[in-house]
């Protein structure tokens, strides 16, 4: 939407450095991308403010903001100054809430690599979205500050965008999941890092519900070349399903290879543009395996598995399990964990079976009679029942 306010080539593949020289009433503070070069009060009760970002960025994340701001320096992270810009009446709550950005920024520097810009400003604004990841100058909605730090995950999402979406950008809009899916899962990773695996599972289960609900309304792949209204791509396929693809990829290649692959992908495309196949190649190199089948079924094919799990009463301490894929079309391929819980709830055991066909069966050792068999107890698979 940048072309609605700024004459520009409004496409993620056309990046530019920016200078914003703004003359505004002198009671306003002005913030924009990059580093402030000048702030001068003029004779007519106006003020000239000059901001410059020399690192080329997509025009969708170029921005200026002017308001009666309270401004706080929150600290340096790896030499990057972090500031908070909030309406003066929200000064106390806003400074407290936005100060979280310092620890969030440190997490992503450690996980992905060096921060691509020279400052990070977090700005209360009238954005139509919950947040907007403007390069080095993130905007959050007006009610994002209340003194409770309730928008920690939103801040993490927008900070993650500084690497994925702003610096390493999608080559075209069809591959926007490389921005939105990565930022969504980036927030998941941060929340897991800070609060533990249970918080990650809770977030992923909510995201899974959003994907399933969307797929019930619209059958479409993550990379959907039929779309002509680009705003229609801002949907759960790009955000939540994109995050789920990354989560399943993490299991497929392993923890260290996943992290290495993300870092290698970012290092290769920092400041540039990429397609899904570029990310696939980076993950194949890191994971030392062919992932063509994985990307075909999760990115280029619509839908997800719909599963039914059956089991027989154990005989001679052996339990027969049957997994059926009920969705239309061919089978998906995935590992599935199945957790049996005894009728009295005191015993449990988990097995992993490889599902490659519409029906998969396995016989396993089991010392008790299951009262239930729970599919995917540790939240690793995108599926519905």
What residues fall within each predicted segment?
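Second-shell loop/turn segments in exported
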Residues: 7, 87-96, 172-173, 232-235, ...
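Beta-strand-rich binding/interaction modules
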Residues: 31, 291-292, 305-307, 311-376
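Amphipathic alpha-helical substructures
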Residues: 227, 235-321
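Acidic/His/Gly-enriched intrinsically disordered linker/tail segments
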Residues: 174, 180-248, 252-253, 269-270
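Hydrophobic helix-coil surface modules that form long, contiguous segments used
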Residues: 2, 7-156, 185-188
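Zinc-dependent metallopeptidase catalytic helix centered on the HExxH motif
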Residues: 98-99, 137-205, 262
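Active-site-adjacent bridging/hinge elements
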Residues: 78-81, 131-132, 157-162, 212-226
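Short acidic/polar inter-strand loop motif in beta-rich domains
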Residues: 377-385
